[in-house]
């Protein structure tokens, strides 16, 4: 595929793709009412991991597909992510001898998703038993399908389920996988591949997710320094010795899927092409969509169906304020800029039901002291020598708990912002965002209030407007518990998930360390997210459904465009992308069963 195919492309004004003899289309009577500029079997809205997976599966079934992307670059939030997939009983785990079954995984999902949700209609509809079973059944097949075509995955060793003490959990890992390192030269774009796939600012190393915890605590032990050296040497060897452009995580995920897409000659991904509205018959059958291109609006006929997988509404301030908890700020999200709810709004306009619109993949988020951008604080808060407090100076959560739970607790406590308070022991051992161990905070970060520093706790409390006596009392109690290694208040450090992001050199509890060594630091934390998790209701076939449970014929959805099968929880690393790609896979299989 030439570089120009990934840039601004207009749609042809003719119908270049004939209706294939083996495909039953929706009938010419309905289409006579509409003039279409382009035809395809399946229109896929969104070029993230779900959309590209759907395109590959379409080709497998002999169906043509057209992927449209509103932004100039492809990949969406998938390209920003760690690239992990949570897929119970996945083939890599089976090959590694890890014991898991669909029944055990179902027990786990029921334990963590359905607890205390008897009155929660949204969870019961979004995470129905048939949808859970569909995910668990088809997830391993989706992974095998991609591997058979050349996609390189690897296990994320030791990454536990996020609720390792729940029934059915795998405390030592096995359900999370991620992309292997990929040579972006294979895309044929040279150094310009960065113009095709969405990038975060700054240069990245070929780092795997399971190495990140060690790399960011490089000041704690020589073993962690060794991990840093291994990553650096990997990058030097692959780039300078072998002449590769090595990428990992979300960039590898999207790049590998794009590369496979290119091998099949499925046609280009049309960038700068935004969904405007779905086109339906008077009876509500979806015929295609109206889209905006650099050359004006065009209509696309989707003979077999439309798949919406264009993300959620993380950057839509109006929708966030309408549906979600407040205060809300679209700037706090880690999702891609184009994540503004277009696909969800389009679905609602043709009768789709919604659920979980008040939810997101929450997590405490800070302003990076070096780069100034919002940063999802995954590891910093789990480390010893720090606490999170509200304005009264009181702790209100297990700081190392799963991030979506932490976001829920922050809103429940009305702690917006909350404050992450830590000392020099934390500062000299661990990175905080892009601020490396022992690195002094930039003056502009101190001036802007991204980070605060003081020689005493009392002075720090006055700087950040937190109750002085409350904070001193909290730290006195916390330090006693840290010395004993037992958090009697919130059980921090008692689960394998907590320990995964802790510091194994700190004993007796790798997540607890007293906050008593000056200087002291504080960083404001807001309830950011990795994207929203509410959206269109879908069934076990990924069909979009109405309030009465009937499907909107010809309309499918996957990923953050839908109400998540994970309900209000986050069961394990990759619980966003795993279901997104699986339900995109399911959608295409169902379309094929209806039309091929």
Curated annotation (Swiss-Prot):
EC number: 1.3.-.-
Keyword set, alphabetical order: FAD, Flavoprotein, Oxidoreductase
The protein's enzyme class: oxidoreductase
Pathway assigned in UniProt: Mycotoxin biosynthesis
Cofactor(s), by name: FAD
Induction: Expression is under the control of the secondary metabolism regulator laeA.
Any one GO CC term of the record: cytoplasm
Coiled coil: none
GO BP term (any one): helvolic acid biosynthetic process
PANTHER family membership: 3-OXOSTEROID 1-DEHYDROGENASE (PTHR43400:SF10), FUMARATE REDUCTASE (PTHR43400)
Family: Belongs to the FAD-dependent oxidoreductase 2 family. 3-oxosteroid dehydrogenase subfamily.
Function: 3-ketosteroid 1-dehydrogenase; part of the gene cluster that mediates the biosynthesis of helvolic acid, an antibacterial nortriterpenoid. Protostadienol synthase helA cyclizes (3S)-oxidosqualene to (17Z)-protosta-17(20),24-dien-3-beta-ol (protostadienol). The synthesis of protostadienol is followed by several steps of monooxygenation, dehydrogenation, and acyl transfer to yield the final helvolic acid.
The protein's name in its UniProt record: 3-ketosteroid 1-dehydrogenase helE
């Amino acid at each position: 595929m030439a570089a120009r195919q990934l840039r601004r492309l207009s749609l042809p004004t003719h119908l270049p793709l004939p209706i294939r003899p083996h495909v039953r289309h929706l009938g010419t009577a309905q289409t006579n009412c509409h003039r279409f500029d382009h035809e395809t079997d399946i229109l896929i809205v969104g070029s993230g991991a779900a959309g590209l997976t759907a395109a590959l599966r379409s080709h497998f079934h002999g169906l043509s597909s057209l992927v449209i992307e509103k932004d100039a670059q492809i990949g969406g939030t998938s390209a920003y992510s760690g690239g992990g997939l949570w897929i119970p009983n996945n083939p890599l785990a089976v090959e590694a001898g890890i014991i898991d079954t669909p029944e055990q995984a179902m027990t786990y999902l029921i334990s963590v998703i359905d607890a205390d949700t008897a009155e929660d209609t949204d969870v019961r509809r979004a995470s129905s038993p048939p949808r859970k079973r569909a995910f668990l059944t088809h997830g391993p097949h989706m992974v095998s399908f991609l591997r058979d075509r050349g996609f390189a995955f690897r296990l994320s060793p030791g990454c536990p389920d996020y609720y390792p003490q729940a029934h059915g959990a795998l405390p030592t890992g096995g359900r999370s996988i991620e992309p292997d390192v990929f040579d972006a030269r294979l895309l044929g774009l040279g150094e310009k591949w960065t113009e095709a796939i969405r990038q975060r600012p700054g240069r990245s190393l070929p780092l795997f997710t399971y190495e990140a915890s060690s790399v960011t605590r490089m000041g704690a032990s020589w073993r962690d320094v060794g991990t840093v050296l291994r990553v650096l040497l990997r990058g030097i060897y692959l780039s300078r010795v072998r002449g590769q452009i090595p990428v990992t995580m979300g960039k590898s995920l999207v790049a590998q899927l794009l590369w496979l897409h290119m091998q099949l000659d499925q046609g280009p991904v049309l960038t700068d092409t935004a969904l405007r509205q779905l086109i339906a018959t008077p009876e509500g059958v979806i015929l295609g969509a109206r889209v905006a291109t650099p050359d004006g609006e065009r209509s696309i006929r989707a003979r077999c169906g439309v798949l919406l997988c264009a993300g959620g509404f993380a950057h839509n301030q109006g929708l966030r304020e309408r549906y979600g908890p407040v205060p809300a700020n679209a700037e706090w999200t880690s999702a891609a800029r184009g994540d503004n709810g277009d696909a969800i709004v389009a679905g609602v306009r043709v009768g789709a039901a919604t659920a979980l619109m008040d939810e997101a993949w929450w997590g405490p988020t800070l302003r990076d002291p070096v780069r100034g951008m919002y940063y999802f604080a995954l590891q910093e808060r789990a480390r010893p020598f720090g606490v999170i407090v509200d304005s009264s100076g009181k702790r209100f959560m297990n700081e190392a708990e799963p991030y979506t739970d932490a976001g829920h607790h922050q809103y429940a406590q009305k702690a917006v912002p909350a404050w992450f308070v830590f000392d020099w022991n934390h500062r000299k051992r661990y990175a905080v965002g892009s601020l490396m161990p022992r690195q002094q905070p930039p003056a502009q970060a101190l001036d802007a209030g991204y980070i605060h520093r003081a020689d005493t706790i009392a002075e720090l409390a006055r700087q950040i407007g937190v109750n002085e006596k409350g904070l001193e009392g909290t730290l006195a109690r916390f330090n006693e518990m840290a010395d004993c290694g037992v958090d009697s208040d919130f059980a921090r450090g008692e689960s394998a998930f907590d320990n995964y992001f802790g510091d194994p050199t700190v004993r007796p509890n790798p997540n607890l360390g007293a906050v008593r060594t000056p200087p002291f630091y504080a960083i404001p934390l807001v309830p950011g997210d990795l994207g929203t998790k509410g959206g269109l209701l879908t069934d076990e076939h990924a069909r979009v459904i109405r309030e009465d449970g009937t499907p909107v014929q010809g309309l499918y959805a996957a990923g953050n465009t839908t109400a998540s099968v994970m309900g209000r929880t986050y069961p394990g690393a990759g619980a966003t992308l795993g279901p997104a790609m699986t339900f995109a896979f399911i959608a295409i299989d169902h379309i094929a069963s209806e039309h091929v």
